UniProtKB/Swiss-Prot annotation:
GO terms for cellular component: cytoplasm. It catalyses: a (3R)-hydroxyacyl-[ACP] = a (2E)-enoyl-[ACP] + H2O; (3R)-hydroxydecanoyl-[ACP] = (2E)-decenoyl-[ACP] + H2O; (2E)-decenoyl-[ACP] = (3Z)-decenoyl-[ACP]. One of its GO terms (biological process) is unsaturated fatty acid biosynthetic process. This is 3-hydroxydecanoyl-[acyl-carrier-protein] dehydratase. Keywords: Cytoplasm, Fatty acid biosynthesis, Fatty acid metabolism, Isomerase, Lipid biosynthesis, Lipid metabolism, Lyase. CDD domains: FabA. GO terms for molecular function: (3R)-hydroxyacyl-[acyl-carrier-protein] dehydratase activity; trans-2-decenoyl-acyl-carrier-protein isomerase activity. Necessary for the introduction of cis unsaturation into fatty acids. Catalyzes the dehydration of (3R)-3-hydroxydecanoyl-ACP to E-(2)-decenoyl-ACP and then its isomerization to Z-(3)-decenoyl-ACP. Can catalyze the dehydratase reaction for beta-hydroxyacyl-ACPs with saturated chain lengths up to 16:0, being most active on intermediate chain length. It comes from Pseudomonas syringae pv. tomato (strain ATCC BAA-871 / DC3000). Signal peptide: none annotated. Pathway: Lipid metabolism; fatty acid biosynthesis. Belongs to the thioester dehydratase family. FabA subfamily.
Length: 171
């Protein structure tokens, strides 16, 4: 069976309900925490490290939930949501590869914020470069990622780590 290399909003919502990779396997969060509208490219080859890459997008509009509360009179998308989106995508990549288990963010190395997402923006683009995947007691991916708004890079993260666990009871 040929793997799908792009995913629509409806595909991602199916993933949030556990319908894309099967019960007990990688899921994206449901809205409002789902920070991606589409994955435009996903591949196990290529990318900066030759281990795979993802490109995904989030459409921005002034009615998004976080603009009303972060901050009143000075609306800006919380930087942690962009970081979480990158973790979401690394976990999605592991599920897309066919690995079993539920995803958990395990940390990151250096994270830099040098721009912001305002309600006047149109589109956020996430670019994830897979550095390494490991399959042992747990399935683990390490990646680098960037967040861009309307074509301008505004965040970067090194050492994004996500693991898949067949049991999360003792995590």
């Amino acid at each position: 069976m040929t793997k799908q290399h792009a995913f629509t909003r409806e595909d991602l919502l199916r993933c949030s309900r556990g319908e894309l990779f099967g019960p007990g396997n990688a899921q994206l969060p449901a809205p409002n925490m789902l920070m991606v509208d589409r994955i435009t490219h996903i591949s196990e080859e290529g990318g900066k490290f030759g281990k795979g890459e993802l490109v995904a997008e989030l459409d921005i509009n002034p009615d998004l939930w976080f603009f009303a509360c972060h901050f009143e009179g000075d609306p800006v998308m919380p930087g942690c949501l962009g970081l979480d989106a990158m973790w979401q995508l690394v976990g999605f990549y592991l599920g897309w590869q066919g690995n079993p288990g539920r995803g958990r963010a395990l940390g990151s190395g250096e994270v830099k914020f040098f721009g912001q997402v305002l309600p006047t923006a149109k589109k956020v683009t996430y670019n994830i470069q897979i550095k390494r995947t490991m399959r042992g007691k747990l399935v683990l991916a390490i990646a680098e990622g960037t967040v861009s708004v309307d074509g301008r890079e505004i965040y970067s993260a090194e050492g994004l780590r996500v693991g898949l666990f067949t049991s999360t009871e003792n995590f």
